[in-house]
């Protein structure tokens, strides 16, 4: 506002205020500021693209994912996931998700299938606070068993202070990493907290805590924390140090990775060109590489690595496609000694060219 006090026709001032409102979650005020910008600067490219970004955020879309994973424990999995999201206003969104997953082991000839159905709502009852609830059912079918289990994912997201993000939630899911786990019908009740703190001098700190109570009477504590530095903003380039701690109440290594103590430390580097901000007919990408050591109970340290990549193309303001891949030998993501690999294809298509409600 001080900028506009000096020059009511300042382009940087008007669009800067629109961006500030948007970053604070005040969509209506942001739209008013960008509309004022376009009144003064007709068809200005940056302002038009900013308006497109807001409209796209509230436009119904379909997202399809196909993935294939395998590890050196002879487990393979194929998965498809379909999501339809329909914003009804700047505050309310409804969605539905269907996921099919088939897992098998080439040595034991054991296989299993799961079908997940979910319905969800999102409600933004304050510019800086939102609530999400997804409820559904998973139907599992293997060589030896068939059952249904309840799925729940619910959480609050908030921005308590500038440059800070907080998420508190509960998630109930079924262990479906491989056929043996599906056979055991283990459901997990996860209570979690995510917290990210940014700064004006490029340093950031992310922390995640999970407490998990399982239906096999086991429980888990998980702490992950990351201290990082933002080297660049376009594209985003950041790097830092990650630490992870896991502790299970009971050790059942024949069933799943469940150490009494697990510690891992790694250095990571990430580069990102965000699909949300690139213009149509542009490439986008993300790569995250990390290496370090893990310590499983009293065993000697083990070298670890992790590579995650995504590469895609935005064909238009409504359609984008990307491929992605992961390779990791970190025990906490699979099981002790495993090397996990996943490749996939993702498509996101805006069903219309604008929101289905009057965006004001």
Predicted feature locations:
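Gram-negative and organellar
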Residues: 1-360
């Amino acid at each position: 506002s001080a900028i506009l006090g000096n020059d009511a026709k300042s382009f940087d001032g008007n669009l800067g205020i629109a961006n500030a409102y948007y970053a604070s979650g005040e969509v209506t005020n942001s739209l008013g500021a960008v509309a004022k910008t376009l009144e003064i600067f007709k068809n200005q490219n940056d302002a038009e693209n900013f308006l497109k970004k807001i409209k796209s955020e509230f436009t119904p879309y379909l997202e399809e994912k196909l993935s294939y994973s395998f590890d050196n424990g002879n487990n393979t999995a194929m998965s498809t996931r379909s999501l339809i999201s329909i914003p009804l206003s700047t505050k309310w969104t409804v969605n539905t998700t269907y996921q099919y997953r088939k897992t098998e082991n080439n040595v034991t000839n054991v296989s299993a299938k799961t079908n997940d159905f979910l319905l969800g709502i999102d409600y933004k009852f304050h510019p800086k606070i939102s609530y999400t609830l997804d409820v559904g059912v998973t139907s599992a079918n293997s060589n030896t068993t068939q059952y249904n289990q309840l799925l729940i994912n619910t959480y609050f997201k908030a921005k308590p202070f500038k440059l800070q993000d907080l998420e508190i939630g509960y998630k109930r899911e079924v262990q479906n990493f491989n056929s043996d786990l599906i056979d055991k019908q283990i459901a997990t009740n996860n209570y979690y907290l995510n917290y990210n703190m940014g700064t004006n001098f490029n340093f950031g700190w992310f922390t995640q805590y999970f407490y998990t109570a399982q239906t096999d009477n086991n429980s888990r504590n998980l702490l992950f924390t990351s201290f990082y530095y933002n080297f660049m903003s376009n594209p985003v380039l950041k790097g830092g140090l990650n630490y992870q701690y896991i502790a299970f109440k009971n050790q059942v290594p024949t069933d799943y990775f469940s150490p009494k103590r697990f510690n891992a430390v790694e250095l990571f580097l990430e580069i990102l060109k965000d699909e949300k901000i690139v213009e149509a007919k542009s490439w986008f990408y993300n790569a995250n590489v990390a290496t370090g050591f893990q310590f499983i109970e009293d065993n000697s340290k083990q070298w670890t690595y992790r590579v995650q990549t995504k590469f895609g193309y935005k064909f238009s303001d409504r359609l984008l496609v990307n491929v992605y891949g992961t390779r990791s030998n970190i025990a906490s993501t699979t099981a002790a000694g495993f090397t996990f690999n996943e490749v996939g294809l993702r498509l996101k298509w805006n069903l219309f060219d604008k929101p289905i409600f009057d965006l004001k």
